[in-house]
Amino acid sequence: FMMSGYFVGYFIGAATIPMIISQVGHIRVFAAFASLASLVILIHSIIISPFVWFLLRVLTGLSMVCIYTVAESWLNDRSSNKNRGSVLSIYMVILYGSLGIGMFFLNFSTPKNFQPFILVSVITSAALIPILLTKKKPPTFKSIKAMKLRELYNASPFGMVSSLFYGTIQSALFTLLAVYASSMNFSILELSLIHI
């Protein structure tokens, strides 16, 4: 139940982020939602309640989709047709590599302590520094027109269906793998390893 909140926020963010970016720009959106993510992470360590954590996960999902959208649209804008695939591939390797490596931090402190929450908040806050200090101009898009689901399906039926299946499988693994591993009495190290 709690982890599903992440994907509720993710869907809300995916529907609203283009409008927010068009109104205030990439840098402010990144700063605002990285700050929100950092704040929400710390609140997890203060309030222990399944309902509150569900709401915090909604805010985390919203924040992360906004951060991802800003990063990916910026990379997309800065790359050419010749190198776009390579640039986005490197980005995805770094993204998923970071998620996998992050799981090993569970081995250094118990989630019952404040330290893991503080560490994640510090890392999230540090992500603001290069974006806020960049001299590069953010992407500018003249107009953002959302595709309807029917248009998206007509443009790429295989892409849409495979993305739907991939998202469903990934979200199930992301939310339930730790629960399964815990029920099977996996150690923290084993749990970290299966998330790679």
Model-derived regions: residue spans:
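Helix-to-loop junctions at the C-terminal end of transmembrane segments
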Residues: 13-25
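C-terminal membrane-cytosol helix-exit motif in multi-pass small-molecule transporters
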Residues: 121-141
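Paired small-residue
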Residues: 51-59
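Residue-level signature of mid-helix packing/kink "hotspots" within the transmembrane helices
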Residues: 7-11, 15, 99-100
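Cytoplasmic helix-loop-helix junction between adjacent transmembrane helices
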Residues: 58-93
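Structural signature of the two symmetry-related core transmembrane helices
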Residues: 28-42
